[in-house]
C-alpha cells in the first residue's frame, strides 16, 4: 500500500509529494558523500522503488508492477525534487519476472556517462551504473569504509590484501588511512 488513507488519490501529485518528502529527509544528514540512497522502497512509502543519487545522476530500480505503471510520473517527480536532469534505469533484477515485467536498463531521462566518480569522506570512488551490482555501488558500507580508514590510520594492521574488490572502496579507505 502506498497510503493507509482509504480516500487518498494515487496520482502524479501524490507521488511527487512522497518523492519530495523522501529527498528532503536525506538532506538532514551530513553524509560526507554525494552518493546517497534517496528512496528505499517500503521505508519511504514506495514499495518496489529504489533510487540512489551518484553525483549529478540518479539511478532507479522499478521492481514492481505498481511503480512500473507510474514510472514516468515518478521520474519527473524525482528530477523535480532533486533539481537534477539525469535518471538512469537499472530495472534488471530477477524479481521483476514475478511481476510479469521484463528487464529494462538505460537512460530514462537525460543522458551521460555511465562511469561515474563520487566523493565520500574526501575520497574519489569510481563506479559504473550500467554494469555495477544493483544500482552500481554499496552505499550502505560508507561507515565501514570510514572505520577501515581509521584502523589503517592507527596502524591496526601492517598489510592489506583486497582479494574480493568490487569498486576498490575499501582499498581507497586503507590508503587514505595510511597516508593520514
Q: Can you say where each PLM-predicted feature lies in the sequence?
A:
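Non-catalytic accessory regions of SAM-dependent methyltransferases
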Residues: 1-55
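Non-catalytic substrate-recognition/targeting regions of SAM-dependent transferases
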Residues: 39-52, 68-137
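Conserved SAM-binding loop and adjacent beta-strand
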Residues: 130-149, 153
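Carbohydrate-binding surface patches
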Residues: 57-62
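Conserved hydrophobic/aromatic pocket- or pore-lining residues that grip, position, or stack substrates
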Residues: 56, 125, 144, 164
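Conserved SAM/SAH cofactor-binding pocket of Class I
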Residues: 145-180
Amino acid at each position: 500500500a502506498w497510503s493507509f488513507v482509504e480516500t487518498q488519490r494515487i496520482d502524479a501529485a501524490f507521488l511527487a509529494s512522497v518523492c519530495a518528502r523522501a529527498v528532503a529527509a536525506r538532506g538532514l544528514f551530513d553524509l560526507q558523500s554525494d552518493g546517497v540512497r534517496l528512496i528505499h522502497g517500503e521505508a519511504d512509502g514506495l514499495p518496489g522503488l529504489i533510487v540512489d543519487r551518484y553525483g549529478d545522476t540518479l539511478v532507479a530500480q522499478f521492481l514492481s508492477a505498481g511503480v512500473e505503471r507510474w514510472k514516468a510520473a515518478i521520474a519527473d517527480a524525482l528530477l523535480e525534487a532533486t533539481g537534477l536532469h539525469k535518471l538512469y534505469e537499472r530495472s534488471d533484477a530477477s524479481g521483476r519476472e514475478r511481476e510479469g515485467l521484463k528487464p529494462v536498463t538505460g537512460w530514462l531521462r537525460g543522458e551521460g556517462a555511465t562511469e561515474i566518480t563520487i566523493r565520500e569522506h574526501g575520497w574519489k570512488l569510481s563506479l559504473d551504473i550500467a554494469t555495477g551490482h544493483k544500482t552500481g555501488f554499496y552505499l550502505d558500507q560508507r561507515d565501514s569504509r570510514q572505520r577501515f580508514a581509521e584502523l589503517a590510520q592507527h596502524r591496526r594492521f601492517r598489510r592489506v590484501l583486497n582479494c574480493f574488490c568490487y569498486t576498490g572502496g575499501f582499498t581507497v579507505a586503507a590508503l587514505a588511512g595510511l597516508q593520514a
